[in-house]
Amino acid sequence: MGLLWCAVMAMAVALAFAHPKQPSTYHPDDVTYPGSVTVFTVPAAFPTSVFSSYYVKPGPTNQPQPVIYDPVLNITFPFNLTDPKHVPDSNDDPVIFPQPIANISDATGEAIASAAVSEISRIFKSNNAGGSTTCSKCIAALAVGQMVARLAPTHFPSGMVSLCHSLKFSTYSSCELTYGPNGSGASWAQILAKADVAGLDGKYICSYLHKNVCQYPTVTSVKAVFPKPKPKKPAEPRRSGKKVKVLHLSDLHLDPRYSVGSEANCTSYMCCRYSEPPANGTVPEISVSAPLFGYYKCDSPFYLALAALQSIGPLTGTSAKNPPAFSLYTGDLIAHDDENQASRAYVEATEVAIWETFKAYIGGPIYTALGNHDTTPADYEAPHAIDNHSTLGSQFSWNYAHVSSLWAHYNWLPSSVAQQASTHYAAYAVSPPHHPNLKIITLNSDLYYQHNPFALLNASNPDYSGMFSFLITELQAAEDAGQRVWIVAHIPTGWDGGSALPNSADYFYQIVERYSPHVIANIFFGHSHEDQATIYYRNNGTAQTREEALVTGWVGPSLTPLQNLNSGYRMYEVDTGSWEVMEAFTFYSDVGSYTNLSSSVDGEGDGGQGEGPVFKLEYSTRATYGPAVNWPSDAPLNATFWHGVTEAMERNRTLAELFTQYQGKSSAKSKKCETEECTKAKICYMRSGSTALGKQCKQGYGSVQ
């Protein structure tokens, strides 16, 4: 039945989008689906054998609480780390301040901070005489704050909390949560102490702190320097005719504190978390009871994570014994916890829990790029150069050492590559087993993320972290060796321009243009939680045509439903000579159906009756879009193909509506794209590989959430 449905759907797409003059050279009926089925119903029972023991066993009214042993740290994480009924509001992690430039008493430091708060309040409350603007006031305030950060850094967080509230940036509780001792106040002391507040850093910082204070800076292009010029006639990569399967997972956001039966439709972020009953004994009203397998406003519970993993084999035709050639994970393992609820141990435990399950179900190496939530505080990564690899520059090395050691432990990386990752922000370059003609280069994209305040330092230098120098070195070595390259990162550099710093995205675009299409075959991202594709062109996208299209950025759909999305993942069929994508299959599960599943599991959760979630083939990229662009059946799904898709959208708006449907993984809650303005914006996003290009598009249509 599932195969028949997919064939009918593919034929319908062909009829709807066929070119009016030329017959398609591609026939959807020729699609060979990768798995034994196109629809798979996951067993309701939780597969308890995936973990050796449990603090709390899985059941119809609770998520499991597995005992997680860390093979690298040689520790067992305690139950109270993830106990859903006792979520912590603080941690014992090191609090790192910049070294003060003078030796002053605590009382003097407190007085300096108090005086600074008064002065900054005066600056903002003064009138605009003399041509002062809100932005210039903010820059002046930063100079005062910098004095506190340099002289009395330990008093800096309390000052930020006070100003955040008094200037009405947010509520006091939110200000305390963000900038207090258990938030990011110490990190902001580091940033202000090191920033060029009177220059570009200051403008970025003010824009970061409040979007209405300073206009967001536009791109200031810095010319990238390469070891060698681009070859005038580079050798064209040859296809082998042999294809392998590659799995692409992204943004699981496992929530080990997910509480079944809690409020799933809450008004505060995030839902499906336990809340204490009122002291008067009344039963709180719950509008939507958190289902066992997850909900639209919640991150992934264990039940959903394991359900998705169980579906991969039947749907893709792979298994632990017959694995994909390799798999990609484009970041974000950790749930969207508030800053005071996270800790280093919480991050480490989640990393182990997820990769243990991946190891059990997927097999083969899994190449991971860290996401902005794969650290604590979330979004924060400091460049080593902030203090020449000293205390501040190495403050996140605990995580780089941990993940790289785990990757070596699971035999996903050779020890030499794991060592490279431990000293390069968890970024590395590796060739998969049996495929020396391909090099995979992963990046830590937090270092160019708009919401990482450390990335705002030395803003005029797009490679302050050295991440792009690392990328150029590896790409040049690949070019010299005749290798193909896949770049794997979390944060997309383009689309609507809302994620990557403008200068960094521009610099990355220059690198892509220099080494494409003869070296870089594909780029893979995550982060948006949505199914998207972006095209990079020659000459910084000034001429967006089929002839100028160079390479595609594939954005993988998320496993988490957050927010208002279905759960999904993708599998590619790839030629082992050119490492071009020849086919892409995307799979999903309807999260809206989960409210009917909770009661079907027995009391122990290890031998349940009934059915769990249904995962199914959502679409074949070739069958869906190929007829619309008359794409030959043996041609790769490359940048030229995707540019053709955007041209087809210009001719037929219905294709943009279909793309938007798939963007949210066919979620009933996703926004639709039914206007000409939306269609034009969507096409513009797809043709925008940098922040500057994306910002030129009509805003407001980038996300379906």
Please tell me what each predicted stretch does.
Residues 1-22:
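Fungal secretory targeting signals
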Residues 19-190, 196-207, 213-318, 326-329, ...:
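Metal-dependent phosphoesterase/phosphodiesterase active-site architecture
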Residues 248-250, 325-332, 365-372, 486-490, ...:
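Active-site neighborhood of phospho(di)ester-bond hydrolases with catalytic His/Asp-centered motifs
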Residues 256, 335-338, 368-379, 449-450, ...:
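Active-site environment of divalent metal-dependent phosphoester hydrolases
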Residues 297-392:
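Core catalytic region of metal-dependent phosphoesterases/phosphodiesterases
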Residues 349-361, 389-413, 509, 513, ...:
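Acidic, His- and aromatic-enriched active-site or binding-groove loops in soluble protein domains
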Residues 358-360, 503-517, 536-549, 573-574:
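Short, surface-exposed basic-aromatic patches at helix termini and helix-loop junctions that form
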Residues 449-469, 473-524, 535:
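Active-site-proximal segments of metal-dependent phosphoesterases and phosphodiesterases across multiple
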